[in-house]
Amino acid sequence: MIEKIQESDSMVKLDAQPAEINQKLFIDFLKNAAKEIEAAAREYFDDFSLSVVENSFVRESLRALVGQNEGGKRIRGALIKLGEQIASHGQNHHYLPIAVGYELFQTSVLIHDDIIDRSETRRGKVTIHVDSAEKIRDSRGNGISEREAAHYGISRALCIGDYGFFISYQFLARCAVDSTVLAKVYQLYSQILAMTCEGEIVDTILPFNRISALDDYDAYKKMVFQIYELKTAWYTLAGPLMLGAVCGGGDEALVDLLKRIAIPLGTAFQIKDDLLGIYSSDEV
């Protein structure tokens, strides 16, 4: 039973009812985990940069990826830590490579997502595809058309996003667990990546498809809830908690329990977020 989260340095004990968890203590836990993840990310990228090919295009692209990866609340990474603490009763502290890799996966997904959504900013920064297009226009002047500049920006951003996906696996490899556990982490991580992409496919194609709530409500509702489950529930809650539990040595029963708790919770979160987006004012 979960009663409260009691933190001492990086150890968290869970022993009370969820409704009784001290909110401030949990927020402090998230903030402390974010600091740990941010520091580890800088270290990992510094190490990785030593092996990067000597090419200015690649190194500039890596810097763009690092810049886009900085900041953020690191909630998913913190949930990986929480999953590990639950599974190991606060005894294991191997979560950081998985958390850093997962946060890089999120950054890479968002780089691609910004192209799909035609977003111009992300975390207060100009998105990579927009920034790349602007810079090539500035450097080439009248020598490049708007269309070609936009195509270049999108192409470069796609490459950088792909680069981030593959680097994230190298970060996971730093996890100091035995090979059997690491293999399970890789397997689950790959599953989460695939399911997130499946959700993105449905989310991208559905608005342009002839299926609508008016024509076939049941089919439309099913697809909307698939998006909720794949893009939010798995990617934001279930996946991180399950990865942490696997890292902490949790058995299949615990991992499955976390999944069964997190998926409906994540779905409910996305429904509420959508409702706020539709009905709330800017002041809310």
Residue ranges and their predicted role:
Residues 44-55, 67-76, 155-167, 171-282:
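All-alpha helical catalytic cores of prenyl diphosphate-utilizing isoprenoid enzymes
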Residues 1-102, 107, 111-150, 200-222, ...:
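Conserved N-terminal diphosphate/IPP-binding helix and adjacent helical/loop segment
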